[in-house]
Structures are given as structure tokens and as C-alpha cells.
């Protein structure tokens, strides 16, 4: 990976058009027809990976080891949701991201 001072502040984005299969009711999580928490997490992880693409050396990759998720709204099938991720801390090989997910324009 490139030096920490180059990677700190890197930003990535990811977009998903919510399908019926992405909802809590379809995944058996609850009876609500809204985006399942695991889908939000996957979208954020995708944005984190996108943030690092130009900073990783050939053969390097990254994966999620810890997360904290607070959901303050919901989206239903047919809605397009977007995730932003920004590298806010680097401690050795551990990177910390700040992420948010929203629908519509910001």
C-alpha cells in the first residue's frame, strides 16, 4: 500500500438500486420491506474498497474486520442508495473509515 500520508483522506463511492431481494422481509430478517442492514454494510464496504483502489499495490486487497452501524432511516425496493467512505485513520495495517449511506441527492 502507498504511504499512510497519501492514503489518509482517500474517498470512495458505491451505488445500489435496491431490489426486492435486498429487503429485510425477503432475507427473513423481519417483516419490513426495507433495505436489510447487511445490504447497507456491503454497500459501505464496497465504497471503502473503492477508496483504496489507487493506493493498493498489485496483489493487495482489504477486508472488513470490524464495523459499527447506526441506521437512522430506511429505503425500499426501487430506490437508489449511495455510500461514501473516507479513510480517517491509519494505524499500521488497520484503516478506519467514516461511511454514510443516503438515498437521493445530498
What are these model-derived regions, one by one?
Residues 15-17, 68-70, 84-86, 100:
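Residue-level recognition of well-ordered beta-strand positions that form the cores
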Amino acid at each position: 500500500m502507498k504511504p499512510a500520508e497519501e492514503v489518509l483522506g482517500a474517498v470512495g463511492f458505491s451505488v445500489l438500486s435496491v431490489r426486492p431481494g435486498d429487503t429485510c422481509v425477503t432475507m427473513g430478517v423481519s417483516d419490513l420491506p426495507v433495505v436489510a442492514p447487511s445490504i447497507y454494510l456491503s454497500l459501505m464496504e464496497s465504497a471503502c474498497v473503492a477508496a483504496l483502489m489507487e493506493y493498493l499495490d498489485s496483489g493487495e486487497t482489504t477486508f472488513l474486520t470490524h464495523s459499527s452501524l447506526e441506521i437512522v432511516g430506511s429505503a425500499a425496493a426501487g430506490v437508489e442508495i449511495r455510500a461514501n467512505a473516507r479513510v480517517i485513520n491509519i494505524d499500521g495495517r488497520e484503516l478506519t473509515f467514516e461511511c454514510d449511506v443516503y438515498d437521493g441527492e445530498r
